[in-house]
Amino acid sequence: MKILLLLIPLVLTACGTLTGIPAHGGGKRFAVEQELVAASSRAAVKEMDLSALKGRKAALYVSVMGDQGSGNISGGRYSIDALIRGGYHNNPESATQYSYPAYDTTATTKSDALSSVTTSTSVLNAPAAALTRNSGRKGERSAGLSVNGTGDYRNETLLANPRDVSFLTNLIQTVFYLRGIEVVPPEYADTDVFVTVDVFGTVRSRTELHLYNAETLKAQTKLEYFAVDRDSRKLLIAPKTAAYESQYQEQYALWMGPYSVGKTVKASDRLMVDFSDITPYGDTTAQNRPDFKQNNGKNPDVGNEVIRRRKGG
């Protein structure tokens, strides 16, 4: 039984596979992070309902939230080394005997008919021999359990990757093409489509219990879109949202493993605030709603309603 208990820690020591999951997306993405970001963005774009734009020529405007940031996870993984540790020491009694050398000194004094003899014994201040005896038994017992992680995390400064925005824009254009909607320059479009990407990044978390541990990396893409007819200035697609998240998780037992690795893609929580409930003011008609028609592809024209209010009408 004792041999078995000794072999188990030896077999399990340093058993593990480390995946360097970063604390925040951006900069140089690694393979799993790329897969998650691509999956969440593809799922969100694929959910967009573009049926109202069938047969139209659309000018596409995509705006993405900035994703600059940094991550900080100090220290390694959770260890229960400090929770289970004990020791017992028993030292025997010891006694030491020292032997100091002695020597005699004799002095004789004579004066006329009188004489005296003086004899003295002295001991050196350094022992000539020492003898130590121990009595009793000596014993030492200790018990402990050490489970150390297979990785460590340090401060990271991560930069935004402009290619992510280009990648997402290309995905949206691909879906438009596959749906039969032509994407053209603004001067040739009869429809303006606005896509606002509020969330486009990764979230890392770690679960640490006494027996169960997990590393989780999520990628989320949340966007809102709407479409406007250039001639009538009416909404062809009212503001709608699409939100998806993908997840990669490694599960451990006492940080040994992982014994389970999983990947999932699912719909996530919607935007905390969206524009689906915004309606025109009561005195605003279809003819003087704000005009999204753009002459140079950059600056929007000023609608009739805005001009009237500026004149104080």
From Swiss-Prot:
Keyword Signal recorded: yes
GO cellular component labels: cell outer membrane
Coiled-coil ranges from the UniProt annotation: none
Superkingdom per UniProt: Bacteria
Keywords per UniProt: Cell adhesion, Cell outer membrane, Lipoprotein, Membrane, Palmitate, Signal, Virulence
Subcellular localization(s) per the UniProt record: Cell outer membrane
Record lipid sites (S-diacylglycerol cysteine): 15
Signal peptide region: 1-14
Region (Disordered): 282-313
Listed Polar residues bias regions: 282-298
Mode of membrane association: Lipid-anchor
Lipid attachment residues per UniProt (N-palmitoyl cysteine): 15
GO BP of this protein: cell adhesion
Keyword Transport listed: no
Entry similarity comment: Belongs to the MafA family.
Official protein name in the record: Adhesin MafA 1
Species whose genome carries this gene: Neisseria meningitidis serogroup C / serotype 2a (strain ATCC 700532 / DSM 15464 / FAM18)
Lineage: Bacteria, Pseudomonadati, Pseudomonadota, Betaproteobacteria, Neisseriales
